[in-house]
Every structure is written in C-alpha cells, then in structure tokens.
Regions:
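Extreme N-terminal starter segment of soluble prokaryotic enzymes
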Residues: 1-3
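Acetyl-CoA-dependent GNAT
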Residues: 5-84, 92-97, 101, 157
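Solvent-exposed beta-strand sheet faces enriched in polar/charged residues
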Residues: 68, 112, 138-141
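Short acidic/glycine-enriched loop/turn segments that link adjacent beta-strands
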Residues: 72, 144-149
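Conserved G/P- and acidic residue-centered "switch" motifs that form tight phosphate/ATP-binding loops
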Residues: 89
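Conserved active-site alpha-helix within GNAT-family acetyltransferase domains
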Residues: 92, 116-139
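Conserved GNAT acetyl-CoA-binding A-motif
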Residues: 102-121
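Glyoxalase I/VOC metalloenzyme domain signal
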Residues: 157-164
Length: 164
C-alpha cells in the first residue's frame, strides 16, 4: 500500500470519500468551507498537510487524511477510509505516516470523533480504531454539524514512536 502527500489532482478523491460518510458527519461535498479546508491541507499552508492512500486498481482514493502539523499538540482534522478498504490497514497506515513525518516529542495527538451515543460510533468503528492506535477518550467536544455528539481522543507522545 502506498501512502503519499496529497496533490491537487487528489481533490475529487477527497470529495468521493466525503460522500461516503456524510450520513455521519453532515454535508461536506457541496460545502465551500470543506473544499477550502481540503485545498489548504493539500497545499500545506499554515501547519496543515494531507496524506492519501491511492487506489492501485483504478481511480479514487482508498483513504485520505487532513492533519495539523504544528506541535506540541498535533491534530487529526479528518480521516476517512473508503468503505471497500475499511479494516485493511489503510487508516492505520495514514496515521503512522503522519506520525513519522510530522510528530515530534514531547507532544500529543488529538482527534475529535463520535461520542459514545452517536449512531455512527459503532457502525463506523472510529472509536475502536483510535483506541487501537493508543488514543484514549478524553473530554466531550462540541456537537457535529449534524447535531451528533463528539468526543476528543488524545494520545501522548513521550518519545519518537510508531503507532500501537
């Protein structure tokens, strides 16, 4: 599997991934602010970066990640794995590559994901995914745009280390 920095031509792939998860996260594909955020991360502006797992069997992306590269608190801003690639290690590989490229210790990595009562929490597997990567549930976060609960997950980085 290849993980690489996103390029401008990957933008439609990010929209394709977003379309697969709008039922959990709310509208993104038609939202100009989402488009701007993806482009800002692809361009690597202001402490932002984007990684992708391109499909080897055709167009589109197996996964994509938007990441905040400024420490000591780093942020997974957005991470989606295509439905056809979930459970195959794509998400883990994206996080591992972000850690390898940008995370320095001491520090921490934060992500906001579904709260425990959100309908997407079990179906998506997001909470379990982050826990398996060494993140721990922390404080509640503001509700998502669709009104569902959110929670911060945090992982302390106390030395140069890989994921789980």
């Amino acid at each position: 599997m290849t993980i690489r920095p996103a390029r401008a031509h990957d933008f439609p792939g990010f929209l394709g991934l977003a379309a697969q998860v709008e039922q959990w996260f709310g509208p993104m594909v038609e939202v100009p602010g989402f488009h701007d955020a993806v482009r800002e991360h692809i361009d690597g502006r202001d402490g932002h970066a984007a990684l992708v797992a391109p499909s080897s069997s055709g167009p589109g992306l197996l996964g994509g990640m938007l990441f905040g590269t400024r420490g000591p608190t780093y942020h997974v801003h957005w991470l989606v794995v295509s439905g056809r690639a979930r459970g195959t290690g794509v998400g883990r590989a994206l996080v591992e590559e972000a850690v390898r490229r940008w995370v320095r210790y001491p520090g921490e990595i934060e992500v906001v994901t579904f709260g425990p009562d959100h309908p997407g929490a079990d179906v998506s597997g997001a909470r379990v995914f982050y826990e398996r990567l060494g993140f721990a549930p922390a404080e509640a976060a503001a509700p998502g745009p669709e009104g569902g609960s959110r929670q911060v997950f945090r992982r302390t980085v106390d030395r140069r280390q890989g994921i789980g």
